[in-house]
């Protein structure tokens, strides 16, 4: 607590106007409880002095904000007189500071809100989840519930406060309590340190209430294990705290958020981070969570508090953000670096069988000098990757089936209807028919490609679509159309890497007409215009005449070597096709399918 308190005192507080408003509100409440406890009277006089100081201060925010923590019984403790018991400066310190400043403003607004709505509550701990359920803060209205054992004792920090301390507040406003606190607290608030707080009541003087509030907070995480809780009211009214915390639905309500020990503010296990910079194991009440914005209005579902304790009282050293969840202090084992030989052996074994028996796994591990667990983990990861790739292959097959159905239904590409260049595409289809390659051949080849890719367990790049509906215009310059009809139909195979070349040759050989092709040349050789690529919606315009598309030396050039063709070279000006490629990036020349294909080459390396 000392540590987080001192951090919070370094953050500039709200201007004294807000303070004076808060104190003005507090000074309107009577405190009959004070007449029972000299220590608390002392605190109350301190509070009034402090209040006068705050009202006399100039509007500039004080350098060290002596923020006031108002306990249930009205006792105040100034947070400025505590020193950190640890010199390390951690990132949590910064977090605590900024969060404190932000939540301090928010809390002041909540004080104002409750002041206006006449809630009889001495400690207006910040509204639950942004003040949405202010009704749960009405802790002094005299409902007749008894505090759990130890709650009042540890909470108020006076020697032995009478249990109905929180009933003694006269009901100065007739505001009824809309939500009777009928929810029992998940765990009775039993504080192991209650005897410390009670014993040191007279001796500790000023620090008693603060220490007790720290105790209250320090074990709040243990006391409120799983239910959705809201920060409740005063340290002495531990019962009221418990009931309203259980009642408020899931609010990550902020504690008083000013001075680090918001009296009795329950620490939300589910709030985002609680600025606790102490080691959680220290028995001092110091690791009270929470300084400004101890329970934040942030994420109700993220990790539990930095220094929270689980139900057994064991400290949970969890990280402050969700990516350091659970036991972040536990060292993660480094990734296993496999050698090439190990990887090759594992891959071969995986190709043979996707699942290993225990005996096979042990043999493989022994052979590769790996542990059994490493082989098992590698196989699990490899199976996951394999399933993902198979899913992609099946997806491609399904899309190929849809595409074929469209083509059979409409006799053309489904993507062409909306384009103004449909006539060019129709001409392309006609040219394809004239050259003897029907669209169905290319579709069948596409089926085979996708099937081969799925069988090879290597995902096809989506760019494969760029060559899909190559309707096979089959324009080889100086070459008869017949031998090249199947070649242009299968030219989309050039978008596959050499890994698929055997499948490509088989697919082309299955085609009627012509010997199986060499490794497919660039599809620009086939001047496959007129048909779109479905994925990008690109139109590859049709080359106007059977001999007009490409320069004569082009067909012999292999795919990867062909540079992007400049526009005048790519198409003679007499071609009827559009001069722009509607969906393509601006840098790509219009008819150079070769460039598109070489792009596919680049992207296929998985």
Curated annotation (Swiss-Prot):
Signal peptide: none annotated. Residues 513-522, 561-576 have a biased composition (Pro residues). One of its GO terms (cellular component) is nucleus. Keywords: Developmental protein, DNA-binding, Homeobox, Nucleus, Sensory transduction, Vision. PROSITE patterns: HOMEOBOX_1, HOMEOBOX_2. Residues 297-314 have a biased composition (Basic and acidic residues). It holds the Pfam family Homeodomain. Residues 266-284 have a biased composition (Acidic residues). Residues 41-65, 119-138, 523-534 have a biased composition (Low complexity). Residues 286-295 have a biased composition (Gly residues). Residues 21-40, 108-118, 166-188 have a biased composition (Basic residues). Its main location: nucleus. Coiled coil: none annotated. GO terms for molecular function: DNA-binding transcription factor activity, RNA polymerase II-specific; RNA polymerase II cis-regulatory region sequence-specific DNA binding. The keyword DNA-binding applies. Abundant in the eye-antenna imaginal disk. Residues 331-390 bind DNA. Residues 1-65, 104-188, 261-340, 508-606 are annotated as: Disordered. Residues 1-14, 315-325 have a biased composition (Polar residues). It is found in: Nucleus. Functionally required in R1 and R6 receptor cells and primary pigment cells for normal eye development. This is Homeobox protein B-H1. It comes from Drosophila ananassae. The gene is B-H1.
